Amino acid sequence: PGRCPKIAQYLDSPRQVSYNREYNVYTGTLMGEPVSVCSTGIGGPSTAIAVEELAACGVHTFIRIGTCGGISTMVRSGDCVIATGAVRQEGTSREYAPIEFPAVPDADVLFALINAAKNLGYVYHTGVVQCKDSFYGQHSPERMPVSGELLYKWEAWKRLGVLASEMESAALFTVGAA
């Protein structure tokens, strides 16, 4: 919720329209187009709620800004990660589509984000991210009862070229497609 006012400053005539629990919503315009900024909380369930409720209000394009933990050594602190897909190692997306359905972003939005990063001169990476439910589990797996499985999967994600670990993209992509 704390990022919303900072992002809303980039809008013309921003105004806060709602604040309830983890959902802080601002609306304004950007280059003449209506734009809203909404926090989604942490994880898939709260992201799915935000996407469903905003879609019911007529929102048709979603861009999530957040943090992630690097898996690839190529990703440095402060780099921009643009997800081309998400490993669905979480539960929310399974409520919307079979696990075989890929969690991928809309191609037009993906290419717009890549072009924006290029034009702004950002250091950015495109690729698959791992989406999970546990904030700490993959980052200190040795203390978890399933440490062997977590370590095995972490190594698999690294070998497969997964860029980063986060908690919302699979829900965003899958709910957005449903």
Feature roles, as predicted:
Residues A103-G161:
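Active-site rim beta-loop-alpha module in soluble metabolic enzymes
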Residues M74-S77, G137-H139, A177:
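Short secondary-structure transition/capping segments
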Residues K153-A178:
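A C-terminal functional module that forms or caps the active site or interfaces directly
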